[in-house]
Curated annotation (Swiss-Prot):
The lineage of its organism: Bacteria, Fusobacteriati, Fusobacteriota, Fusobacteriia, Fusobacteriales. One of its GO terms (cellular component) is cytoplasm. It catalyses: UDP-N-acetyl-alpha-D-muramoyl-L-alanine + D-glutamate + ATP = UDP-N-acetyl-alpha-D-muramoyl-L-alanyl-D-glutamate + ADP + phosphate + H(+). Keywords: ATP-binding, Cell cycle, Cell division, Cell shape, Cell wall biogenesis/degradation, Cytoplasm, Ligase, Nucleotide-binding, Peptidoglycan synthesis. Cell wall formation. Catalyzes the addition of glutamate to the nucleotide precursor UDP-N-acetylmuramoyl-L-alanine (UMA). SUPFAM superfamilies: MurCD N-terminal domain, MurD-like peptide ligases, catalytic domain, MurD-like peptide ligases, peptide-binding domain. It holds the Pfam family Mur_ligase_M. NCBIfam families: murD. Pathway: Cell wall biogenesis; peptidoglycan biosynthesis. It comes from the Bacteria. It comes from Fusobacterium nucleatum subsp. nucleatum (strain ATCC 25586 / DSM 15643 / BCRC 10681 / CIP 101130 / JCM 8532 / KCTC 2640 / LMG 13131 / VPI 4355). One of its GO terms (biological process) is regulation of cell shape. This is UDP-N-acetylmuramoylalanine--D-glutamate ligase. It is an enzyme of class 6 (ligase).
Amino acid sequence: MKKAMIYGLGISGTGAKELLEKEGYKIIVVDDKKAMTSEEALNHLEGLEFFIKSPGIPYNDFVKEVQKRGIKILDEIEIAYNYMIEKGLKTKIIAITGTNGKSTTTAKISDMLNHAGYKATYAGNIGRSLSEVLLKEKDLDFISLELSSFQLENIENFKPCISMIINIGPDHIERYKSFDEYYNTKFNITKNQTEDLYFIENIDDEEIEKRAKQIKAKRISVSKFKKADIFVENDKIYHDKDDIIDVDKLSLKGIHNLENTLFMVATAEILKLDREKLKEFLMIATPLEHRTELFFNYGKLKFINDSKATNVDSTKFAIQANKNSILICGGYDKGVDLAPLAEMIKENIKEVYLIGVIADKIENELKKVGYEDNKIHKLVNIENSLQDMRKRFTKDSDEVILLSPATSSYDQFNSFEHRGKVFKELVLKIFG
């Protein structure tokens, strides 16, 4: 019997386990909290065909020992893709990565294709593994697949028909030796693409432009600011000379969503979707939860949940769309440069409530740029911050309360979804 080891029983690991067991593999599960520990697993490495590492697990001593023994390390994405090839599945993969905007783009491309009459779904770093989707959903025309840099580290055969990198900004410095290593890992999404396949290229992004020339796939350019295959001019989206839609008719608002929309339009044009169907969809598409989500009004006081903002660039977009708001910010310390965040807050934010283990560092950066002490409230967590606001604000307070943390949630929460859910529940409890 063929044998494989799975390290980490999260969404990816569970999906890979189910798929491989269906294919007759004996699976050894290693999970320091739920199954065999990594220390015990050292005695079970003989005879493995390969080793699957969950994306969130770093290259720790156990993984390095697996590497040292010459055992092939794969990700769940590679396992699932190989399964598709072996079974002769005709489903096409549209692969999406980027620092920000990838979840919205992934989900909305799937919705757009369904609206156009195809059978499509989404998978990947968006709550459902590719393996799970392949086992449960049959006869799909397309899978819109969100990929994090972690999921792209061990690509061998994976080859999407369309790939895209929405944008690249500093993130995950705790995982990679340098930002260059992080950026280059993102480009593994194009590694096996050939001239008959497509890469959608954001020519507004300097880091993408630096690396795009090495890509073999046909490049389709998008831009918010200059001429491209898909571009914005005079508040309209164009494909070459063809007017696709007025920007003010888009249901997804904000400069960040305009960028996401350009990738949707590029995908639609590559696949030759009916333009009227495309236009219809762009006028009714709804935003995802936890992404600049206005979810509650307490009289004039508005609450926006942007818990998905797990890096500085993402919070920048939220601040640009909600200037002069009161910001709740902070969380896990990812080791990134906080000076740009401090400048952004100084220029655009009325007051800031700092939470999480990174609060002191943000406060120090704010003081360096001259942000007034009386505008900084350091109250440890979301609940304390909201309780303080309840004492200060009434239904007549014409303010926007924006949760946009600029970092990960792992110091106090299980995920950004958990953080956003708790924020919404606390707002309703305290102000509802």
